[in-house]
Amino acid sequence: MTTQHPDTPETGITPGGTSGAFRDVLSKDHARRGKPPLHFVDMTPEQRVEKAAELGLPKFRVKQLANHYFGHFDVNAAEFTDFPAAKRSEAAAAFFPQLITEVTRQVADEGTTIKTLWKLFDGSLIESVLMRYPTRTTLCISSQVGCGMDCPFCATGKLGLTRNMSTGEIIEQVRVAAKMMRDGEVAGGEGRLSNIVFMGMGEPMGNYNSVLSAVRQISAMPPEGFGISARNITVSTVGVVPGIKKLTAEGIPVRLAVSLHAPSDELRDELVPMNKRFNTKQVLDAAHDYWLASKRRVSIEYALMRGINDQAEHAQLLAKRLNHYGDNWAHVNPIPLNPIEGSKWTASKPEDEQRFLEILHRAGITATLRDTRGQDIDGACGQLAAKER
């Protein structure tokens, strides 16, 4: 059972999405648009069987389709060799409509970082970033077109929010990346996609239902999912407290990442506008509750900005606030600020970054300076702007 904190509002996200005044924050600039075509992963098991029946296909064909998609990353009718030849194209069109189309692919870090710009069915643009490390391969995926959080140092935040992405649009990013790894399209040869981070475009808690459905299917074993362990999936948030509480209740052992960026309300109000709705205490209370329930250490994301939030007093206050809840429940990831066009914010001096880390370490806080992968292709944290080049 989670601890109740009197300052934390109990209202917010409901099974149907968001409610009340909270909705306008997550849906700022949201335009009503047509929905993406219904994809296999958007359907319930019953809907899949019904769709198959409409095509004159028996129930067992649904499992074959699932195996093609999750087990072999196939959506091409030519690969459905276990299907009647006359039904292959019809089944592919009905269950696997094309939801994302590659526009550009940019490569950095000697071919181990790949940023892909995708066009969705309505012309919207989103990006994903695939990063190969010596011991793992991580895909950073988007969950919304744009973002309504309006953080001034983030390129995505400057776009505003266009719409939520469907489960299918989210999962297709994963399928394509998994296929790229299997087929050896990433420097280093054939491999396996091992980690997923919801740290691309958008606020995942603002598209909770689609994100959760994606998490469940990404982590389920084939033929129900891709078989990527939930422990290797990270769901990030700027501090949408109702979403954190809802995720806590799910009992899925994903890692929670909180984009804190400041240790005080005065400073965080400026850097993360959502703080005016859910303040630092409420966010940290909810994050600590997540740790209590899951025993998964929470990641605290902290973009270091020169002369803004990178001084000794900031590190000391951050350590004090985290230690208030006890030991070893959170891991801090200071992130050297990645440059974005027209921004007044700049990266911290290297010596200030190291001092910040040392202060946290002396206070008993585990902290690791984040790698800035993909910076030269605008693929690093805070740089995703979905621009055609």
From Swiss-Prot:
Instruction: Tell me yes or no: is Transcription regulation among this UniProt entry's keywords.
Output: no
SUPFAM superfamilies this protein is in? Radical SAM enzymes
InterPro entries, A to Z: Aldolase_TIM, Elp3/MiaA/NifB-like_rSAM, Methyltransferase_A, RNA_MTrfase_RlmN, rRNA_lsu_MTrfase_RlmN/Cfr, rSAM
Query: Which Pfam families does this UniProt record tie to the protein?
Result: Radical_SAM
Stretches the record annotates as Disordered: 1-23
Compartments, record wording: Cytoplasm
> Could you tell me the gene encoding this protein?
rlmN
One of the record's GO cellular component terms: cytoplasm
What is the enzyme's class at the highest EC level? transferase
User: What does the entry's cofactor note say about binding and number?
Assistant: Binds 1 [4Fe-4S] cluster. The cluster is coordinated with 3 cysteines and an exchangeable S-adenosyl-L-methionine.
Note from the entry: Reaction proceeds by a ping-pong mechanism involving intermediate methylation of a conserved cysteine residue.
Q: Where would I find the Radical SAM core domain in this sequence? A: 133-376
The scientific name of the source species is Bifidobacterium longum (strain NCC 2705)
The catalytic activity, as recorded, is: adenosine(2503) in 23S rRNA + 2 reduced [2Fe-2S]-[ferredoxin] + 2 S-adenosyl-L-methionine = 2-methyladenosine(2503) in 23S rRNA + 5'-deoxyadenosine + L-methionine + 2 oxidized [2Fe-2S]-[ferredoxin] + S-adenosyl-L-homocysteine; adenosine(37) in tRNA + 2 reduced [2Fe-2S]-[ferredoxin] + 2 S-adenosyl-L-methionine = 2-methyladenosine(37) in tRNA + 5'-deoxyadenosine + L-methionine + 2 oxidized [2Fe-2S]-[ferredoxin] + S-adenosyl-L-homocysteine
Its function? Specifically methylates position 2 of adenine 2503 in 23S rRNA and position 2 of adenine 37 in tRNAs.
Q: Which residues bind S-adenosyl-L-methionine?
A: 202-203, 236, 259-261, 338
Q: What is one process in the GO biological process aspect for this record? A: tRNA methylation
Q: What is this protein called?
A: Probable dual-specificity RNA methyltransferase RlmN
The keyword Cell membrane belongs to this UniProt entry's keyword annotation: no
This protein's major location comes to cytoplasm
Q: Which UniProt keywords apply?
A: 4Fe-4S, Cytoplasm, Disulfide bond, Iron, Iron-sulfur, Metal-binding, Methyltransferase, rRNA processing, S-adenosyl-L-methionine, Transferase, tRNA processing
- Binding positions for [4Fe-4S] cluster? 147, 151, 154
**Family that this chain belongs to:** Belongs to the radical SAM superfamily. RlmN family.
